[in-house]
Structure formats: structure tokens, C-alpha cells
């Protein structure tokens, strides 16, 4: 097989790689925060890669998004999404309940623009639905420091804890999330592979959640073919 048409994602910690054959590059740029690429593949359709890691594909994006939606209480009327610039989670939430108020805080506007161009599915919303989604281009940590609103649910839909996203897995950030939740509100955060990341990410994250007073902490796993090990997870907890 001609390796010039193979896109690799390699995990140094586990020493494993995942790869996909691509037909061509559709987009490539270096934003202020990360390297952004979109490749066209036969099996997965368009695929979004950030800093060399597979993020989103036309064919299997719903595994991730639907799992997150299922974890989000239906009674949530005011939801904050940190990250989520592809609009995948936001669009499914607004379709589930058109009266839901959603705030997306995405650090990189390029992610929104590229997603709208190459993954348009989640941007095909009615004017009423779009009016209920408030997009803010900002750092999630900075936003929470000045935030005065209490949310029913907070979803942290970020990249892995490296680079700009590293702070989103800190105790300081989780404490800010907790204080921004209504009583009984929930936080949902992507927590990596339950196979590769249990000791280095998931268990430490559970301890941080517990240390700030979050309760009913659970880990949910789901299939994600383009992510390392093919299985991914969300951590969920509730403000007491």
C-alpha cells in the first residue's frame, strides 16, 4: 500500500497507531491554537484532524454526539458547551428541544468555519433554532472566571488534555464548572479511552471531580471507530 495516502495518528504513551487511507486533502491550515486538516476518505467521508489527531468524520460522528446527548438530562433548559465548535452536540440538543438555550464557548473560530464548510449537517437549523444557540469565541477557562449564569448542564467537548485543552482537565477548571451549575445540575466531559487512559486520565479526573464536591460520578463508554482503541468515554457528575 502506498504510504503517501495513509494518515496516521500515533499515541506515544501506548505505542499504538490508528490510520486511514485518504483520497486527498480538502483543507489544511495552522490556526492560532492548532493545526487543522480535513481529508477526504472512502470509508469515513470527510475527516477532521486537529494537531494530527482524528476528531470528527461524516460517517461515525454520531456515535460520540448521540452518547453525549443521551447523558444530558432532557429537562436541561440552559446548557453550556465548552468546545463543540463543530455544532454536533448543540444541533442535536436543539433538535431534541427547540426551546433549549445553548451557549457554545469555542476557543478557535477556525474550527467553526471549517466545520460549517466540510461538515454542514449540524448547521442546517431553522432560524429559531439558530437564535437559541449563542456562539462565543473565547477561552473556556477565562469565560467561566467571569461567568455569572447558573446552567442546568455543562458539557466539556474538548480535545485531549494537551495544548490549549490541558487546562480544561485541571481541578481549578472543574471547580469553576461546579460553581457555574445549578443545584442538581450535571457536568459531562470527554474522558479519553477507557482502555488506554484509565490510569493517566480517567482515575485522576474522578479524584478531581470528587475533591470539588461533585457527586454521582459515572463513566460511560461507547464505540468510536476512528479514535485510539476504538472505544471512548464520558465522565458525568452532579452538583450536590
Identify the residue ranges that each predicted region occupies:
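C-terminal lobe and adjacent flexible extensions of AdoMet/dcAdoMet transferase-like proteins
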Residues: 236-240
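Active-site beta-loop-alpha junctions enriched in small/polar residues
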Residues: 192-194, 222
